[in-house]
Amino acid sequence: MSEFDVREGVLDAVIVGAGFAGIGTAIRLRNSGIENVAILERGSAVGGTWRDNTYPGAACDIPSRLYSYSFTPNPHWSHTYSGSGEILDYIHTMVREFDIGSRIRFGHNVVDIIWNEGAGHWHVSIDGRPDVRARTVVMASGPLANASLPNIRGIDTYEGHKIHSARWDHDYDFEGKKVAVVGTGASAVQIVPELVKIADTVKVFQRTPGWTLPRINRKVQAGTKRRYARYPQTQTLARSLWFWGHESVALGVVWKTPLTRIVELVGRAHLRQQVRDPWLRRQLTPRFRAGCKRLLMTSDYYPALQKPNCTLVTWPIATLSPKGIRTVEGVEHQFDAIVFATGFDVSNTGTPIPITGRDSRVLADEWSAGAKAYKSIAVSGYPNMFFTFGPNSGPGHSSALVYMEAQIDYIVEAISLVVEGDLHSADVRQDVQDAYNEDMQRKLAKTTWNSGCSSWYLTEDGFNATMFPGFATQYVNQLRGVEQGDFTMVPRRVDLPQEPAQVVAHS
């Protein structure tokens, strides 16, 4: 991968993160004629979440046709639901086909971002590297960037092998080992079926069971791939059918409606069909409404739990000990390895990178009680900065890529206004942002996410800064164009000429 020099002058845009969002933003900016752009990636390769999540069984629980960009469809998906390796290949293909590689700088960990009001640009500090200046910044690092270990007493005393699902140790040999899996969320239900095939014993520690629906993962026939490649409109139609199918599910998982009951009936029928033991069925039956937590899509998890070498443990964990896990009833379970399938540190309070805006405002302080933004993308007081998958942009029923693509197109339009309109700053008005968030919270109060269960969607005091309370079509429609009246736009002063950065590729 070639390198480039971004030290001289000011870039039109800096993109933080080279995952799905960062690569997609760079592509759309390039398509719009904005090429004075750098992507700063702390890792050594593109891919973000799909580069990091390489655990056994890692796959997407959204159909591949929908978990991809409409502007770069892939007719060659091998299955209805793709594995992590195939998704990562898709991201690499986008980088090659749109020649984005020369804009990426790896090993660039952004540690601080500060707005320079006089100059009208952002000052981006990079750990151990020269600083970068940019007229606009796109925060594309995403909410699933930092693995989260559980806050369990004694976790540092355990002497065996510890593995987080998002930082999988491929050198560790599970064969013949006694293994614990802590967590029963989206990654755990994919890991457990693979571990029971090779480990001596697997014990799954469950805090609360989730609603689990069947996932029918069919292999895509060669003829179908050829048809999609030759007639792209047929793949567009397939994507549309998947989209509207998922859109209808919103009625059952976003709000409590008669369709919620149907979703729960499907979940219970799936459980009854796959689990014969009444005691185990009771332990796996959720005690909250479908949709309150993320739905789990799998047809392999329940059968894996019933393998002779697998045990479900429902007693709460009291502490980790040097040899294993002790539960509250006093039993100590000894293990060679513990797998923490405990998700990510989702920044719905604070920010993963320190950001200082106008008048020395610190975004982490403003978000300490719950993150708020305008349409999930812009924050008042932080001009020319845009977020992908910012506050209240999470889908509970559809593809993240549908939401992300709408965000990217909106952000590209906003950046074009700044760059081509030669603006000093575009800052969303505080009154507009406040009105938007008041409306969000009113609508969220009526959703299943705020119906009483504990989930990573909510802060400790119950504030929902994560999910969008509506259909995907509603989210996309609100981003169909930048309403310039919602922003304070200031022209750049003619007496402050700024030389653009030299983005020069090095072979």
Which stretches of residues belong to each language-model region?
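Rossmann-like dinucleotide-binding core of oxidoreductases
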Residues: 3-10, 14-20, 24-45, 139-276, ...
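Beta1-alpha1 glycine-rich phosphate/pyrophosphate-binding loop at the start
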Residues: 5-15, 20-104, 206-207, 273-279
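Short hydrophobic core segments
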Residues: 15-16, 110, 132-144, 179-182, ...
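Short beta-strand to alpha-helix junction loop
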Residues: 74-93, 105, 182, 254-263, ...
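Alpha/beta-hydrolase fold catalytic core
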Residues: 261-334
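Glycine/threonine-rich phosphate-binding loop and adjacent beta-strand/alpha-helix elements that clamp
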Residues: 337, 341-416
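C-terminal active-site-capping segments
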Residues: 405, 409-507
